[in-house]
Amino acid sequence: MTKISKRMKSLSAKVEDKSYAPLEAIQLVKENANAKFDETIEAHIRLGIDPKYTDQQIRTTVSLPKGTGQKVRIAVIAKGEKVAEANSAGADLAGEEELIDSISKGEMNFDLLISTPDMMPKVAKLGRVLGPRGLMPNPKAGTVTTDLISSIKEFKAGKLEFRADRAGIVHVRFGKASFSPEDLLENLKVLHEAIDRNKPSGAKGRYWKSLYITSTMGPSVEIDIAALQDSKEE
């Protein structure tokens, strides 16, 4: 049984068992983010989907207008002039066979992997290593592309890839505790729109089941989904 710390008990006591208006929830999460570092703010969204069916899966990207506040380390697998192009665009790592070899050995000092289409047959062989970590490049996520310059700049600026896990829950970071409540809310609205826009064709019944936000070291707070929808229309 997991022991709950006195700090977490104290913070959890501030959160009522109810769904909050979006801005109120964000302010409460920020108030509880009192660790000695700039905590990441995350959203955990339960959707009415069963990802074991291909027509109920969601995997896409979203460009957060206020960014994520987090430095993203990007690796690029390409060859020839594309390697130089990736480096000039700000990739942290770029290469061909040597990078593939280091990844196969478990050396993955990056948060995102981009590949050019011609390298995907070789990258596919790294599935056992990349797959469990959610790092396999995918065209739907914008990580298989010939336009390396645009892709790298977009992901560095705050573009995020997200997907639902096996339970149909999407986990996404959308800012830092140091962000203003208004900036966090703007990012959350854009995330909400992206999930709606990419609703799987096989989704049945109520699409949005629940939405909780939390900081790295704080308790979760439920957001009133209807209120979030209303705030988007204001």
From Swiss-Prot:
<dbReference type="GO" id="GO:0006417">
    <property type="term" value="P:regulation of translation"/>
</dbReference>
<dbReference type="GO" id="GO:0006412">
    <property type="term" value="P:translation"/>
</dbReference>
<dbReference type="GO" id="GO:0015934">
    <property type="term" value="C:large ribosomal subunit"/>
</dbReference>
<comment type="function">
    <text>Protein L1 is also a translational repressor protein, it controls the translation of the L11 operon by binding to its mRNA.</text>
</comment>
<dbReference type="InterPro" id="IPR016095">
    <property type="entry name" value="Ribosomal_uL1_3-a/b-sand"/>
</dbReference>
<dbReference type="InterPro" id="IPR023674">
    <property type="entry name" value="Ribosomal_uL1-like"/>
</dbReference>
<comment type="function">
    <text>Binds directly to 23S rRNA. The L1 stalk is quite mobile in the ribosome, and is involved in E site tRNA release.</text>
</comment>
<keyword id="KW-0689">Ribosomal protein</keyword>
<dbReference type="InterPro" id="IPR023673">
    <property type="entry name" value="Ribosomal_uL1_CS"/>
</dbReference>
<dbReference type="InterPro" id="IPR028364">
    <property type="entry name" value="Ribosomal_uL1/biogenesis"/>
</dbReference>
<keyword id="KW-0810">Translation regulation</keyword>
<keyword id="KW-0699">rRNA-binding</keyword>
<dbReference type="InterPro" id="IPR005878">
    <property type="entry name" value="Ribosom_uL1_bac-type"/>
</dbReference>
<comment type="similarity">
    <text>Belongs to the universal ribosomal protein uL1 family.</text>
</comment>
<keyword id="KW-0694">RNA-binding</keyword>
<keyword id="KW-0820">tRNA-binding</keyword>
<comment type="subunit">
    <text>Part of the 50S ribosomal subunit.</text>
</comment>
<dbReference type="GO" id="GO:0019843">
    <property type="term" value="F:rRNA binding"/>
</dbReference>
<keyword id="KW-0678">Repressor</keyword>
<keyword id="KW-0687">Ribonucleoprotein</keyword>
<dbReference type="GO" id="GO:0003735">
    <property type="term" value="F:structural constituent of ribosome"/>
</dbReference>
<protein>
    <recommendedName>
        <fullName>Large ribosomal subunit protein uL1</fullName>
    </recommendedName>
</protein>
<dbReference type="InterPro" id="IPR002143">
    <property type="entry name" value="Ribosomal_uL1"/>
</dbReference>
<dbReference type="Pfam" id="PF00687">
    <property type="entry name" value="Ribosomal_L1"/>
</dbReference>
<dbReference type="GO" id="GO:0000049">
    <property type="term" value="F:tRNA binding"/>
</dbReference>
